[in-house]
Each structure stands twice: as structure tokens, then as C-alpha cells.
């Protein structure tokens, strides 16, 4: 562990990495509870996988942006600590697998040399900020949302208000009304808008709140048709503060923001946000966009001369994979990456290409692809030749034949049946039997290995969810077929209808049935969703019902795609959020750490951060005593109320503030984040912790 101790220039990052290393050692020594340790490592991008003894590492790449240097660094890390395979996720991250837990701190330290983080890539935190991959180059965009996504990432990274929420929190930025970043299915979704105010064009966002997929998808609500850009950060802060305080914590399946919105309603939720305004770090927060407005430059003006031999393939590639940018003479190249998987040898060659002949930028996309940006028109033939050598010129970027799929049973604990195996087979069927659909961008197929929808199956035109079906004494891998979802645009979307559950090996036939029926019966130029609505859910159920019959299964039906042995259902424990075992001593120890964090923030004159660390320490301390009493601690608001009832009203504990516990805690939203209040709140927090610690010691003695 010594090798990286003096190589990290940023002391905050160094502290993070050293803390992870220290906690790993304490965990191995049995000094940290497994569930508490899991919460810590998840917040550092370290995720358990299906195979025992190794970890998946999620590398957080805001809005998918990567430079040549960063891609080289990721490739080096993958070769050194993993197996050389890179997986692009539907949140524009990169995942690598089969990493030893002991080596994760040094892996992280290597990534930080090129400003790449693991922090909050997993766990109950603000996940990677996604954005349209065409942001900044889209001919139809009002403005580039990239600097706003970037500012959001930086502002909330390590921010105390969102370190230990009840569940993960996802945000997206769409460049245009096409809503390619899928605002309607996010906790907070933003769509770029421009509005004339006082005779001048102003930048802002349409804002959507409370969306999500999973087993119970919810369409987000529009809360602002136009939010001025300088109110973006304060608005997000308010939503996060309310979610942190009122969100469910004990029942994981009901802990996402969408369930809180459903419970209290949008108006009441926004009222709670207003109550927090006095505590905001900033009342408005102008975002500097100048770094994103620099002239696009190229390392060399030299253009290698090449000769295209197969002009038909080249023209087909240009038609389906090349996008004209709003910058005159520049184009973006879409690279279709099968299942989002590619290897470090190709990654390095690609990194060299964009450095020498591009503008040193690419973006990983929400559909698990790569978009190479800022390519001069005259270099397109050269790029085609070079990308062809890498196997990166397959046409059909963002088309029906560009299937989205999560890793499923390959590596994920929660995978029920293979998602990558069926995806490969469906792509084979489309290429060989439906070549006319290769460049069809109207339809999308998405696949998830379980109900959690990491592959976004329940918002696809045609979706598949991994399941199992019992046949006698045996289990067969199965797929639930969903139809009718999609992106409408401008914040509107559709969730797919669940139709039938079929054996996995019949997945290709279900696709044939759907496409053949559409081709045979659609009206002229009728779109798929229009056709689906016209025919209705029952029609499609009847169309597919025969495939659900399990009375005539063959031996092959009991083997999943890509396997030669009978299917075994093996589901582990999910780690998207920590399931917490509350040990009293551990909770109080964590309270001490939070008080220390509050003190450090105060000494650095970060008043707002110090106040929230103090608040977290108070809640954590109260939770410890309530847990010891067997009281519910589902929400922070519930903890505050219960502590008054159980300890203050019964005179078991007295507060230095001589108030109710609620009045003591809620000073946080009654005061602006000043030095004086931060100091007072911190001292009151220390006094409260001391009183609780004394009470507990006395209780243990008796």
C-alpha cells in the first residue's frame, strides 16, 4: 500500500484511498461489520460480483467523456488488475471485473493520476451524471449541456448531503427535445431549453422529478418547464436534502425517490424543498462554461492518404455511423460496441487515433457504444480504414441491431438468466434474417438479466427480462417479453407492457413473430408504437401465448444461452444499495468520524459542509440509541420524531439547547450556513454525542 501514499497530489483524494485501504485491513481483521464495510466499499466503486473472492470495479466517467490519456490509463489499470476487458454501462461508466479486493486502493490511486475517480460510482449516492453523447455538437441543441453535467458532478462529489442516502440517485442531461438522455426515467432529468427574458436569450432546463425503472417503473413529473441555469445546483441540493431526510432506509425495495414522491405527492415534496432553502450552500450558482467553449484544435494537420477499396461498405458506414456536427466541417463517428465489451489492445489504438488525428475526445454512450467527436471531413476515409482494423466499422450504430444488455449472469449477483447470450443470438437473427432492419433507428431492443432493469428492458420497444420457469422438478431459463415502450421526446416516455414469460431458447422466435406480424399488417409508413397501440396489448399477448407452453420442452431448453449444462438458478445478494445491520458500537464510532469531518470542514471554512456533517452525526447518534431500544429507524425524519418520544419526553436524556430534539436538529433549516451557526451547531452536536455516550455506558453498567 505504500507505493501510492506520496503520489496523490490531492489530499482529499489521498485520504479517500488511504481510508479504503485501512478499512479493508480492519475488515480482514474482523473489526468492521461486513454490512458496514460493504456500504463503504460500494461508495468507492467496489462492487461484489457473482464469482467469489473478486470484485467488479466501476469507473465513474461523468457524461462518458474520456481523453486519450484517460483511456490509456484505464487500459493499463485493466491489464494490471483485471483481465483486459472493458465494459461500457448504460450510465456511461466503464466496469472491469475479477479484481482482488486488496488491490483496489492501488488501482484507484493509478486512475487518479489522470483525474479518474471511483468515488460514488456505486452505493447509496449520486451515481454517474449522464448526458446526451452528442451534447456540444448537436445541430439542434439550444446550448451545450456538458458544462452543466460537469458542474453537477463536481459539486455533489463527496458532498455531505448525499453520502449516505436511503438509495441511489440518478440524474441526466438531454441536449435536445429528443431526450436521448432519458429524463423521464431519472430521479432528476434535465432537458436544455432557451427562453427570451427581457429581450435576451437565457439558458435553462425543463426539469423532471421522480422517475425510475426497476420492477415498478414510474414516469417522472415535470416540476419546471423552464428553470434558469443558475438555479440548477440549488434545486438539486434541495431535492437531495429532502430525499436524505424523508427517504425510506429500511425497506430497500421502497427506498428510491419515486416511492417518496408517490407517498407525499409532488406539491408536498416541493414544499419540503422550499423549507430547506435557507440552508442551501448557494441561493444561485452561475456555472462557468468557458472551458467548454474553447476552439477545437488538432495535434497535426497532416492527413494520411488512403484508398477505400469497398466503397459500398464505406458509404453504408457513413450513412449509419457518421453524424454531422454543428461545427462546420466536423463530424462524429459512432462505433457500435457489441454488448458494450471491448479490450485494452483496441482501446489503446483508439486512444492514439483520437489524440493524433482527432481532438482528443470520445464519449461512451448510454447505449453502450463509443462516439468519436470532432473528426475533420477529409480524415473520415482514414478513420474508416483504421477503425476497420479494430473491427469498429460495423454499420447500425444506435439501430435495432444495436442491442442493449446488462452483464447478467456473466458476472452479476442478481442475474437470473443470461442477457448477453440472448442478445448475441438476437443480433445474429437480425443480421441473417432481417437485413432491412440493420439501420432501423426507430426500434430498440433492450435486455436485463433480472427485474432491476440495468439493461432498461422495460422502456424498450421490445424488451426481455431474465427469469426462470419451473417445469416438473426442473428449472428452465426464461424470458419475460415486453412490448410498447420508448422515448416520445421532450420529457415524455412510455414503459413497456409485460406480455408473456417464455423459455429463453424461444426468445429468437418471439422476435420473429413480432417483426413478421408488424411487416405483414402495418399500414403504409406506420410506426411500430402506433401499430402496437392500434392492435392493443391483448392482440400481442395472443400472438405470443403459444411460446409460453412448457409441456413440450426439449433438453436444450433447460440450458441457458452460452451454456452446455442444465440451468441452475443462483441469485446472490444485491449491492446497488447497502442492507445495513445496525450495530450500536459501530454507529457511535461512525458518529465520531462524522464529528471529525464536521470539525475539519469548519477549519477549512466550509460552513455548509460542516453543518451537514454535524447533522449527520446527530442523526447517526440518535439512531444508535433507538436501535438499541428496538425502535424503527426507517427515515431520518422518523428518527427525529421517535427520539423525542422515547428519550426527550421521558427525560432520559436532556439537551444542552433545552429544546425538543426536533427543534435542536431542525436548526439546520432555520439558519443560513454562516460561520457562527456552523460553530454553534458543531458544539451542540459534540455535547449531544457526549450525553448519549454517557447514557449508553450507564445503561451497559446496569
PLM region spans:
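Inward-facing hydrophobic residues that define packing positions of alpha-helical scaffold repeats
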Residues: 595, 602, 607, 614-615, ...
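Long, charged low-complexity segments
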Residues: 579-581, 585-600, 622-702
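Peripheral terminal and linker regions in Fe-S/redox and tRNA-modifying enzymes
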Residues: 1-597
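Structural signal for well-ordered, non-membrane alpha-helices
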Residues: 153, 240, 515, 599, ...
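Short, hydrophobic/amphipathic alpha-helical patches that form generic packing surfaces
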Residues: 241, 616-627
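Charged, well-structured alpha/beta interaction segments
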Residues: 606-610, 626-629
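Short, solvent-exposed positions on alpha-helices
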Residues: 526, 608-612, 634
